[in-house]
């Protein structure tokens, strides 16, 4: 979580936009994101130049020499944040509007990169030089605080806090997934260097970014010292789809600022016939919309064959199974209703997971995980596509704490089940002797089938009732009589004083 001072600076930046006449939250977050990208472009270019120098490799800066726009040219160095942020307001505005912004919208001239696809219609909306100057100063201060912070992922937390200002609740049934929950799911799935990873409802690409960061931490040498695997990581590993062009723009920039140059981020209604993907991905990480609007006529027919429904949370599960290759794995968030819903469609998709594939884990999460934006109760489902069954025992875990208070404040706390969840999931042999009264345990497939494929942990968890010994009736009556006498004596004493 970011510090109070950093939060205050971000809130202050928001106030600067409001005072300058830009009040639409989506416009504000877009403009901030563009400016953060421009700042990070300068930093990443410097970093890559240093890395190339250390390895003795040639490197050509994107800011070298002159930049040409039509018949005009400008020194490329003037497009760097570290240079133009010292310009007077009027000159800074002119350089930003006429040079820097067109430069970033045409950064990849081939128009095939995820970034350039959705920058074509991007517009620089800051109305005055004074507003731009104030915003640049505010961002410089925010970056200073981020650089001073000891937090591991302060930039990600800062960006998450920025995104939280888009609205107080999800649009179209989508809620921002907390970063620590995303990280937990990524660690549970342990992505490999040859994985092909997809989020069919990617939003700002949080799952894809986290998977990329995890691979950098755990598979760095395997990926970055092998030309073929590095090419796969940069160009062929990450796929994200969404129906919101603004989210796609932000998601593409999010990926690029995390060092993934060319993810496949595309506009697509994943549930419709325009999504042709079948048996393509080895790993799906997702938190699909729960109650989004749905045009039933556009839903792909093969998804309706699995479960005939208008509920997006069920259709997305059918979609994940279709998009995964045999042996492919999935970790996804679902609302609790998916686990125990009694409709034909609910039972059909649960039966398909249990009987037709290999359901591995159901991790129930407390309702406060998505606060303050939503109070919905959710669970993480983990399964492998086999096409012919394979479920033996399903692992259940009852998460009661995630490291933050479960109220609207979401303050950090000592109670955190996430490290225990990750450790136990990766050491299943230690779970076989666990009892139903404990926080995690296995349930045999047949027992699940016998219970209409109910996947709610409360169906199988046993609660130990500790007997409470109460005093005998005679003792209670004696105590009451004693109290009565004390009250009477007190009243008599009070009357004597009047």
Describe the residue ranges of each PLM region.
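Short beta-alpha connecting loops at secondary-structure transitions
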Residues: 236-239, 268, 299-305, 364-366, ...
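Conserved S-adenosyl-L-methionine
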Residues: 172-286, 291-293, 302, 310, ...
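Conserved nucleotide-binding/hydrolysis micro-motifs of P-loop NTPases
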Residues: 42, 204, 245, 272, ...
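Non-catalytic, mostly N-terminal accessory regions of nucleic-acid modification and defense proteins
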Residues: 1-193, 264-275, 364-368, 390-405, ...
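Conserved Class I SAM-dependent methyltransferase catalytic core
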Residues: 28, 243-250, 265, 309-383
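C-terminal, active-site-flanking charged/polar segments
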Residues: 358-359, 371-421
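Gly-rich Lys/Arg/Thr-decorated short loops/hinges at beta-loop-alpha junctions or inter-strand turns
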Residues: 164-167, 295-302
């Amino acid at each position: 979580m970011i510090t109070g001072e950093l939060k205050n600076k971000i809130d202050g930046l928001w106030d600067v936009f409001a005072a300058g006449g830009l009040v639409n939250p989506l416009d504000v977050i877009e403009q901030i994101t563009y400016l953060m990208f421009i700042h990070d472009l300068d930093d990443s270019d410097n970093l890559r130049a240093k890395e190339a120098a250390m390895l003795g490799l040639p490197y050509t800066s994107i800011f070298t020499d002159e930049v040409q726009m039509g018949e005009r040219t400008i020194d490329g160095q003037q497009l760097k944040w570290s240079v133009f942020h010292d310009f007077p307001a009027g000159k800074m505005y002119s350089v930003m509007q006429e040079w820097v912004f067109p430069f970033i919208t045409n950064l990849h001239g081939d128009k095939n990169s995820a970034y350039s696809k959705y920058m074509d219609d991007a517009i620089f909306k800051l109305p005055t030089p004074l507003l731009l100057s104030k915003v640049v100063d505010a961002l410089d201060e925010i970056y200073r605080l981020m650089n001073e912070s000891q937090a591991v992922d302060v930039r990600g937390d800062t960006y998450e806090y920025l995104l939280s200002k888009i609205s107080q609740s999800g649009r179209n049934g989508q809620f921002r997934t907390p970063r620590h929950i995303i990280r937990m799911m990524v660690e549970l799935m342990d992505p490999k260097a040859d994985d092909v990873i997809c989020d069919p409802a990617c939003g700002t690409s949080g799952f894809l970014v986290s998977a990329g960061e995890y691979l950098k931490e755990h598979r760095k040498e395997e990926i970055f010292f092998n030309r073929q695997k590095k090419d796969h990581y940069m160009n062929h590993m990450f796929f994200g789809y969404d129906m919101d062009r603004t989210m796609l723009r932000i998601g593409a920039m999010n990926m690029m600022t995390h060092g993934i140059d060319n993810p496949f981020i595309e506009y697509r209604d994943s549930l419709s016939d325009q999504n042709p993907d079948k048996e393509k991905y080895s790993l799906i990480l997702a938190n699909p919309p729960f109650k989004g609007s749905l045009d039933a006529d556009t839903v792909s027919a093969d998804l309706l064959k699995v479960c005939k429904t208008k509920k997006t949370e069920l259709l997305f599960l059918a979609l994940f199974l279709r998009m995964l290759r045999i042996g492919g794995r999935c970790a996804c968030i679902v609302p609790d209703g998916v686990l125990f819903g009694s409709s034909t469609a609910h039972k059909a998709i649960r039966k398909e997971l249990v009987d037709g594939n290999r359901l591995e884990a159901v991790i129930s999460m407390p309702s406060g995980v998505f606060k303050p934006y939503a109070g919905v109760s959710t669970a993480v489902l983990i399964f492998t596509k086999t096409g012919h069954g394979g479920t033996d025992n399903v692992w259940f875990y009852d998460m009661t704490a995630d490291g933050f208070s479960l109220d609207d404040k979401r303050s950090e706390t000592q109670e955190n089940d996430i490290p225990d969840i990750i450790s136990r999931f990766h050491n299943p042999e230690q779970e076989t002797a666990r009892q139903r009264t404990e926080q995690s345990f296995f349930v045999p497939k047949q027992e699940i089938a016998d219970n209409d494929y109910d996947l709610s942990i409360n169906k199988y968890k046993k609660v130990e009732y500790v007997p409470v010994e109460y005093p005998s009736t005679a003792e209670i009556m004696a105590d009451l009589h004693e109290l009565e006498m004390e009250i009477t004596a007190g009243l008599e004493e009070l009357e004597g004083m009047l």
